[in-house]
Curated annotation (Swiss-Prot):
Homohexamer. SUPFAM superfamilies: Sm-like ribonucleoproteins. Keywords: RNA-binding, Stress response. GO terms for cellular component: cytosol. RNA chaperone that binds small regulatory RNA (sRNAs) and mRNAs to facilitate mRNA translational regulation in response to envelope stress, environmental stress and changes in metabolite concentrations. Also binds with high specificity to tRNAs. This is RNA-binding protein Hfq. Residues 11-71 form the Sm domain. Belongs to the Hfq family. The keyword DNA-binding does not apply. InterPro entries: Hfq, LSM_dom_sf, Sm.
Length: 82
């Protein structure tokens, strides 16, 4: 059940930043920093676009994703129902 919730949060987050075209900074596990906008994603990878170029990034290589602006995924602020 926890795995389902984590997947749903991941999909909710990625879908939100894709729809709103929120700029992201993505850190890979090897320390590389990528920046851009998510244009597409699936269970294994995401497509990051910047300056007219696209990069296919495998999710297993991602350490951290930081939005360039505050986002609100759920109504009612930061508190989430269990």
């Amino acid at each position: 059940m926890a795995a389902d919730r984590a997947q749903n949060l991941q999909d909710t987050f990625l879908n939100h930043v894709r729809k709103t075209k929120t700029p992201l900074t993505i850190f890979l596990v090897n320390g590389v920093k990528l920046q851009g906008i998510v244009t597409w994603f699936d269970n294994f990878c995401l497509l990051l676009r910047r300056d007219g170029h696209s990069q296919l990034v495998y999710k297993h290589a991602i350490s951290t994703i930081m939005p360039g602006a505050p986002i609100q995924l759920f109504e009612g602020g930061e508190d989430q129902p269990a």
